[in-house]
């Protein structure tokens, strides 16, 4: 049986990150952590208790993030964990998808400190999805 790669993160676009974090905090009790400009002002959203490595302690539950909504990037998407991001990028293209790359360099994955290598792509139906090669567990 072929290995299944799990969904490990979700991402939602926001026109106003402060307003959106207040909404999800008040309705669902989620916690938010604003990252700096060097990380594109991304907001980490915790939906469940996380360990020291930042990953959820409860199996099957995922955390997420908020990013600035743009005309080209205005839909909610998921992040799928992979063992080898470059191999997964090739598989996406072979299957008819389009590699968008990371936020910082088109066609190349971003190296997110403390997290791993990240890359976005469009599937055959035009859905924006991302892949993540997590850093090895210490």
Annotate each PLM feature.
Residues 2-4, 11-60, 94:
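Core segments of cupin and vicinal oxygen chelate
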Residues 20-22, 54-55, 76, 88-90, ...:
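Short acidic, gly/pro-rich beta-turn/loop elements at beta-sheet edges
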């Amino acid at each position: 049986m072929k290995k299944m790669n799990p969904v490990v993160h979700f991402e939602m676009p926001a026109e106003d990150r402060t307003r959106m974090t207040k909404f999800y905090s008040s309705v669902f009790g989620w916690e938010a952590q604003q990252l700096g400009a060097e990380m594109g002002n991304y907001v980490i959203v915790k939906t469940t208790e996380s360990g020291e490595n930042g990953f959820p302690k409860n199996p099957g539950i995922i955390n997420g993030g908020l990013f600035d909504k743009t005309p080209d990037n205005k839909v909610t998407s998921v992040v799928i964990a992979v063992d080898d991001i470059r191999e997964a990028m090739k598989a996406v293209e072979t299957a008819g998808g389009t590699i968008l790359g990371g936020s910082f360099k088109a066609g190349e994955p971003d190296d997110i400190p403390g997290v791993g290598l990240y890359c976005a792509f469009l599937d055959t139906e035009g859905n924006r999805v991302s892949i993540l090669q997590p850093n090895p567990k210490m």
